[in-house]
């Protein structure tokens, strides 16, 4: 089992497209079980309507973490994208996954 904490503070968000991810974890997650975690603190983030929390998802057999937004109004979650960041956005969180 891997337990990790992280602290990411951007100085420039760039112009990436697609889902926001933390890539290159040192160990791949278990081939049959997902992992996850939570963003415990964030700052300088554009407003997220009905934000019920920011989640982390690691698919089975993966070394990438996808940052997700939970909408408390709809009960659905969606991946964060470039529009959910400013040049000085910061995220701190915790992550757990089986190997």
Regions found by a protein language model. Give the residues of each.
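Surface-exposed molecular-recognition determinants
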Residues: 1-99
């Amino acid at each position: 089992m891997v337990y990790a904490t992280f602290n990411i503070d951007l100085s420039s968000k760039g112009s990436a497209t697609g889902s926001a991810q933390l890539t290159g974890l040192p160990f791949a997650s278990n081939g049959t079980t997902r992992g996850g975690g939570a963003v415990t603190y964030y700052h300088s983030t554009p407003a997220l309507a009905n934000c019920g929390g920011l989640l982390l998802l690691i698919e089975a057999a993966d070394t990438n973490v996808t940052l997700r937004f939970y909408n408390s109004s709809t009960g659905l979650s969606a991946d964060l994208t470039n529009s959910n960041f400013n040049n000085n956005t910061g995220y701190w969180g915790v992550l757990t996954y089986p190997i």
